Amino acid sequence: MSVQGIEGVLQQLQVTALQASGSAKTLPAEAGFASELKAAIGKISENQQVARTSAQNFELGVPGVGLNDVMVNAQKSSVSLQLGIQVRNKLVAAYQEVMNMGV
């Protein structure tokens, strides 16, 4: 597992998060790995909160909230969470590989 592979997965996570938010923010030119990971986790949390809120609004009968919106938000949340889990798995595997290297 190479660092470039991990960075590629992290970039895919960032692109997915930006597309899900619908915003055209520019990424900082030089950001640290920890800050990028924290931002990605924050975006996953935000997606889950949006899905939870839309589901609650649908249950309460708030006008303008359709079942299709609830289902789309739930799927966005699910996909972003699964992607986050896969990134975590790759990071753990890379860490274990580095720890098993001989000195």
Curated annotation (Swiss-Prot):
Keyword field: Bacterial flagellum
Cellular compartments annotated: Bacterial flagellum basal body
Main location: other
Keyword Cell membrane: no
Any one of the GO CC terms: bacterial-type flagellum basal body
Family, per entry: Belongs to the FliE family.
The name this protein goes by in its record: Flagellar hook-basal body complex protein FliE
Species lineage: Bacteria, Pseudomonadati, Pseudomonadota, Gammaproteobacteria, Enterobacterales
